[in-house]
Amino acid sequence: MWPKKSWSKRLLSKRLWRYYLRFSERMVTLFRIINITFILGSTSVILVIISLFTPPFSQAIVYIFSLLPLPDMPSAAMSSPPTAYVVLGGGLTNDHNNQIILNRYSLNRARTAAGAYHDLPLPIVLSGAEAPWLGQWLMEHGIDGLISENASMNTCENARFTAKRIPLRHVYLITDSYHMARARRQFALNGINSTPLPAPLPVRRDWMKPAYNLSHSRRAVYEVAAYLRDVIRPQMDCRHAKDVTSQQLLTPRGSVAKNSDE
């Protein structure tokens, strides 16, 4: 028979050993979970990064956007047919002579409007600081009777100021497919229903041209972030219709405006 002290020490040693084994097993399990999580997370990140260079990523974003519901609108807006085209400006750039011209986004929207107009002549409303240049391009291509809203500086103002510029219930909305969901939402918030007429981006998706696909993916990611921002915390820099006068909406800006005044 062992002495009491030896037995106590042996019992304590066994308990410590069991605790150690349990602790070791738990740590091994924890490290396995961390390892699996790291592998799955790393694989997911790599797959997402790779997908940015392929067409399906941006196509999936456009599809998801198409499923998003619009805010409630007046029944008249829901039941009436489109009565005008609304073209949202996409930006300006400079040519080799340092003259201001439409950038490729705005140019594609102008071309989309021209094609739609020739198929179904309806009034064309040009919204944004790009309106004078959009109007000049359309007039050069045989389209007149344009209605310009020159004051808006962002999508929220596009909708508010267009609604103030001319009474509309339902329009064909022309912008790119990534911007479309956010733009339609803003117009719906201002009581205007919209049928999308997406304009193409400057470059097309192409499995053989990863850089083109990345351009689409970057645009898609930006619009996802902008849409969420608009829903969670509306733009602080969006002026209300009462903050601008009718004269401001009618007054063109920039070099094209000066030429037309002369």
Which residue stretches match the model-derived regions?
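A general, composition-driven signal for non-globular sequence regions
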Residues: 1-4, 9-12, 103, 143, ...
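A structural signal for short, hydrophobic/glycine-enriched beta-strand patches
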Residues: 55-218
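Extracytoplasmic/periplasmic C-terminal soluble domains
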Residues: 181-262
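N-terminal membrane-anchoring alpha-helices
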Residues: 2-81, 240-248
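Short alpha-helical segments used as structural interaction elements across diverse proteins
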Residues: 29-32, 106, 226
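Intrinsically disordered, low-complexity N-terminal regions enriched in serine/proline/glycine
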Residues: 18-19, 171, 226
